[in-house]
């Protein structure tokens, strides 16, 4: 299948960032070397973010480049954050709570990703002998029922020495970005086939410099402290593109600590963050995920098919739990409980298409009083914006965006999605699934092309799909897509979605044991 212009731009962006970092300059350090501050390899830490989010607008794709006022607001936020952290009192209370024995360190800086991918592994590992789990967060509250002893904060490993180290790293980063901004030899590297991308790409890089000098300097200093003072046996990251996790895995790898990347979301040719994979192993959903990562130049021998921990919690909903769910959202007896996994429009270049699809879903649902549509907002979504599209339809209710959508999928009769990772959860559970994909929407191609779900392309087709749900509860949708669903699951999911947690734990234990045997 021919790649879209958007995907080709993402791949070109990744190629450029890699080439810029490695380009030789006679008698001068390369960009990768310029941004190396002892063991802190900042170009490598920032590269995935740069290629995925910052450079595509300079190539004419991705989210629009920030206006001057937008950049100034970002600079003000960065400066406010720097002032706040400069005044932050030193706190090393979690150092004393670090467990004795070998520790598996889970990098849980994005709460909903940590909840879906890391917490199932942390909980299961905590019940075993051997590796002790520690999940490192950024002041996230401990989930109800979780073992508080396993939750640490980067800011409770914030010693006076760590603060001084962060300041040194920040000064080194400021100097490196200043050289890039003011030296014509380095600026000339920021080009595509001889065409200069300065100032467009240059402004994006320098904008990233604010983040690097403050936020990433602090995370790098804490990572250096954790690696040198506590030395975990293995590190686990759920987000290969997040510069915060990359700071930890980069410093861990430099110290000989094995690192594991656990796949979070669906990935295809657009997932160019995997071009910057630098861990020892990648734990992926299924055989097709392995093929995708290999296509992004991840060595095949470093990819392990484990299945996803997020799927283990999908199974086993009881009749009482399902009735409690229906009662909570006041679903009338006889109505179908249809859950919509909504998506944020913030910083999305296809936001107008997204809003049109949401509006079509709400209009179709409102016209079917025997359905109750339960809208589960994305954790980063502007709920007021989405709620306004639903008007005052009595059979549309909104849930708390902070809750776990997997619980909703397990309890519902049918699922409506816009292409997020939760789409696979619904397919795994065999739920009738509708995924609108209007012309111009680029974020659900994996599921759209699978044939495993219903894909209405217009407002009228969305209405027709909801009509099918109302008529037979989704039986016809499931029957029409059954064969494609079975094929899709065999390619993308290990053992029907079960056992991912145990296989990830086995991978961690093996990596830690192998590292120990080398010392």
Regions found by a protein language model. Give the residues of each.
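Catalytic binding pocket for nucleotide-activated donors in carbohydrate/polymer assembly enzymes
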Residues: 279, 292, 297-307, 390-392, ...
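Conserved catalytic-core segment of nucleotide-activated headgroup transferases in glycan assembly
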Residues: 118, 123, 311-388
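A nucleotide-sugar donor-handling region in carbohydrate enzymes
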Residues: 72-88, 157-168, 172-174, 181, ...
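Catalytic donor nucleotide-activated moiety binding site of glycosyltransferases and closely related
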Residues: 197-207, 239-242, 247, 254, ...
């Amino acid at each position: 299948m021919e790649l879209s212009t958007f995907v080709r731009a993402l791949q070109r962006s990744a190629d450029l960032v890699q080439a810029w970092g490695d380009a030789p300059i006679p008698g001068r350090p390369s960009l990768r070397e310029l941004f190396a501050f002892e063991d802190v390899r900042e170009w490598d830490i920032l590269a995935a973010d740069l290629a995925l989010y910052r450079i595509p607008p300079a190539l004419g794709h991705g989210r629009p480049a920030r206006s001057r006022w937008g950049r100034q607001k970002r600079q003000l936020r960065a400066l406010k954050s720097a002032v706040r952290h400069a005044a932050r009192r030193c706190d090393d209370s979690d150092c004393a709570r670090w467990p004795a024995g070998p520790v598996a360190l889970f990098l849980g800086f994005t709460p909903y990703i940590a909840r879906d991918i890391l917490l199932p592994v942390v909980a299961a590992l905590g019940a075993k002998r051997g590796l002790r789990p520690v999940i490192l967060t950024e002041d996230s509250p401990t989930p109800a029922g979780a073992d508080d002893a396993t939750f640490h904060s980067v800011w409770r490993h914030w010693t006076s020495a760590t603060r001084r180290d962060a300041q040194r790293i920040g000064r080194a980063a400021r100097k490196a970005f200043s050289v890039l901004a003011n030296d014509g030899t380095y600026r000339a590297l920021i080009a595509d086939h001889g065409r200069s991308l300065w100032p467009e790409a240059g402004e994006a890089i320098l904008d990233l410099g604010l983040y690097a000098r403050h936020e990433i300097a602090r995370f790098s200093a804490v990572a250096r402290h954790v690696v040198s003072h506590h030395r975990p046996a293995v590190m686990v990251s759920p987000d290969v593109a997040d510069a915060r996790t990359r700071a930890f895995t980069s410093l861990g790898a430099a110290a000989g600590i094995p690192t594991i990347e656990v796949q979070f979301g669906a990935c295809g040719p657009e997932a160019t963050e995997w071009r910057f994979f630098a861990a020892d192993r990648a734990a992926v959903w299924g055989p097709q995920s392995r093929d995708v990562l290999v296509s992004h130049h991840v060595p095949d021998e470093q990819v392990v098919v484990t299945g996803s921990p997020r799927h283990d919690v999908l199974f086993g909903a009881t009749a009482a739990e399902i009735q409690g769910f229906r009662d909570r959202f006041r679903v009338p007896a006889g109505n179908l409980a249809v859950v919509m996994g909504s998506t944020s429009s913030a910083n999305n270049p296809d936001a107008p298409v997204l809003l049109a699809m949401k509006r079509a879903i709400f209009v179709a649902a409102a016209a079917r009083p025997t359905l109750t549509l339960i809208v589960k907002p994305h954790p980063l979504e502007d709920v007021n914006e989405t709620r306004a599209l639903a008007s005052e339809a009595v059979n549309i209710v909104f849930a708390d965006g902070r809750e776990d959508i997997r619980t909703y999928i397990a309890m519902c009769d049918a699922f409506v999605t816009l292409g997020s990772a939760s789409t696979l959860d619904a397919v795994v559970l065999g739920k009738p699934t509708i995924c609108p994909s209007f012309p111009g929407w680029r974020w659900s191609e994996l599921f759209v092309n699978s044939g495993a779900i219903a894909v209405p392309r217009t407002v009228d087709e969305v209405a027709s799909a909801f009509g099918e749900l109302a008529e037979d509860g989704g039986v016809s949708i499931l029957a029409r897509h059954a064969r494609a669903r079975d094929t899709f699951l065999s390619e993308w999911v290990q053992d029907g979605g079960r056992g991912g947690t145990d296989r990830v734990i086995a991978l961690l234990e093996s990596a830690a044991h192998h590292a120990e045997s080398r010392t």
